[in-house]
Amino acid sequence: MKNEIELIGVYGSDKTHAMSAWTSTNRELTEEKQNRIPALLKMLAENGHETPFEKSSLHFLVTAEIASHIHCLKHRIGVSINCESARYKELKDDKYYIPHDWSNEEQILLQNHCVESLEKYHAALARLTPTLGRKRAKESARFYLPYATQLTFDVMFNMRSFVHFQRLRNDEAAQVEIRDIAQEMLKLVKECGEFEHTLIAFGL
């Protein structure tokens, strides 16, 4: 199964960032000032005046393997993240990720491993529940889950933190899976059409 990314919420725009910056002088938005928004955003980005870019929000729903979830968890400033938990519920969908750049033979081996591990997870949960209780059984049976298990989580960035995320994760040095996620996120933000000049200002 592939990792999936959906943009489920957007607050703000290029105008929001510009108006935040103009709060320090005059928030009255004339036609002349509106025409200066692209240049203003470029100046702010180039000179490190980035607090106005914290006034917007980008909210994504992501389904990805554990490694990419951990990569996202490492971004804490201006980022909020919640994830489904195998401690609180049984993961019944049996979702797992197969690397697309592996050979067909290797993909089959991993798929078989995931299927077997998930079967053991469900079986262990059933065996452990009578003696340990449902709560402890759920949180301990998950040790059978493979690292390829996919979790669904929602993550929200402000634009400043999103730019930081892009610079680190949408990079050749990043792991392929998180880089693919970052690229898809950027594509979705571009398609929403609210941040054209902000993204240009940061070279994205």
Language-model regions, residue ranges each:
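Family-specific signature for flavin-dependent thymidylate synthase
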Residues: M1-L204
